[in-house]
Every structure is written in structure tokens, then in C-alpha cells.
Amino acid sequence: MEWKITDGLTDYDAAVAFMEARAAAIAAGEAEECIWLLEHPPLYTAGTSARPADLTDPDRFPVYESKRGGQYTYHGPGQRVVYVMLDVGKRGHDVRRFVEQLEEWVIAALAEFNIRGEIRPGRVGVWVRREDKPLTLGGQPAEDKIAAIGIRLRKWVSFHGISINVEPDLSHFSGIVPCGITEYGVTSLVDLGLPVTMGDVDVALRQSFERVFGAD
């Protein structure tokens, strides 16, 4: 397993090209699995289920058509993007379980900072309750999304992956309806009052990976 960390901001098209090539090499038995930690410049990506109406400000940032699952999401500075090039075939050929493991991995990493991340039926990603915010219009406790998940598989090897909000400009999410969900907001570790660095998050991800996926 290679853990790859890239400083600075990585061009989106270049990242996709790397992932596609690496996934093909993994499927061919020519490369080891790879977890790639990086940040992108501000941009929006549209997953395979994206609705045009959910792109509310199409001129704000570059928009990329992504072949990952899911709807619209934002990437930008202060957000840890985690691209997972893993052999799902040798991990059981169970895509649903693999997505659950990605969610469990994020939840385990957040727990290192005493943040309780939760999953919700019908809402892929990881959520945190906001007791400090008013109830929703439906009278439910407010919840904000702290991490998004969207993957693609080719020959049973995954690519794309996870984005965790560490300290992004949350106003940048206002140009889309994130993941097609209007009732809930977005948050970050810093927004929750934690002085967490990207390096802290990387350590938490590395430490919690083996607990979820087994030894790398």
C-alpha cells in the first residue's frame, strides 16, 4: 500500500489521469494499492446523478463532469481529499460494504478529535449533529455534512473517494446544492471549534485505516 501526500493544490484533470492510470495498473497486477491525500483549487464536480438545477452558480468556479457516483460537490483549499485506489475485488466484491467501510473510516478518524460522525439512510457521507443550531423545519435536530463520499470502480478497483472538511471556505458550497440535499448544511472541523491541521487529519486517517480495512 502506498500512501501519497501532495502539498499545494493539485489540478483536477491531472488527479483524474493519475487515478485512472493507477487503477488500471492495480487491476493488471502491476502496481500496489494507493491512498492519495491532497487538496484541489476551488472547483465543483458533478457525479453521475447530478441534477443541473443543483448547480446554482455555474460561473463561480470551474465545473468538472466526474464519472464518480453521487451528485454535485465542492473541492477546495482547506479540504482534505482522499483518493482511494483499492482492489475491491480482493476485499470481497461488495461495493455497498466498501462504501460503508469508507464511512466507518471517516467516522473513526473524526473520533480521534472527539467528533461523533454519523451516517444516515439515504444520505451518503458523514454527518454531525448541531445542537447549537435551531431545529429543522421538520422539527428535527440540525445536522451538517462534514465529509462526502463518491467512488467509481473499474475492473473492481476503486478511484475517486472521500473529502473531509478541515478548514475550507464554507461559503464556497453555496454555488451548489451539496449532494442534492437542501435541508442540511455543511461544516468543518475548524467550524466546530477544533484547531485541527491537515497534518493532524492525515495522522488520524493513517492510524484508523487498519482498524477498518485490515493491515495495509
UniProtKB/Swiss-Prot annotation:
The active site is at 179 (acyl-thioester intermediate). InterPro entries: aa-tRNA-synth_II/BPL/LPL, BPL_LPL_catalytic, Octanoyltransferase, Octanoyltransferase_CS. Pfam families: LplA-B_cat. Keywords: Acyltransferase, Cytoplasm, Transferase. One of its GO terms (biological process) is protein modification process. SUPFAM superfamilies: Class II aaRS and biotin synthetases. It is an enzyme of class 2 (transferase). Pathway: Protein modification; protein lipoylation via endogenous pathway; protein N(6)-(lipoyl)lysine from octanoyl-[acyl-carrier-protein]: step 1/2. It comes from the Bacteria. Substrate binds at residues 68-75, 148-150, 161-163. GO terms for molecular function: lipoyl(octanoyl) transferase activity. It catalyses: octanoyl-[ACP] + L-lysyl-[protein] = N(6)-octanoyl-L-lysyl-[protein] + holo-[ACP] + H(+). GO terms for cellular component: cytoplasm. Its EC number is 2.3.1.181. The record marks 145 as: Lowers pKa of active site Cys. Disulfide bonds: none annotated. Residues 29-216 form the BPL/LPL catalytic domain. It is found in: Cytoplasm. In the reaction, the free carboxyl group of octanoic acid is attached via an amide linkage to the epsilon-amino group of a specific lysine residue of lipoyl domains of lipoate-dependent enzymes. PANTHER family: LIPOYLTRANSFERASE 2, MITOCHONDRIAL-RELATED, OCTANOYLTRANSFERASE. Catalyzes the transfer of endogenously produced octanoic acid from octanoyl-acyl-carrier-protein onto the lipoyl domains of lipoate-dependent enzymes. Lipoyl-ACP can also act as a substrate although octanoyl-ACP is likely to be the physiological substrate. Belongs to the LipB family. This is Octanoyltransferase. It comes from Ruegeria pomeroyi (strain ATCC 700808 / DSM 15171 / DSS-3). The lineage of its organism: Bacteria, Pseudomonadati, Pseudomonadota, Alphaproteobacteria, Rhodobacterales.
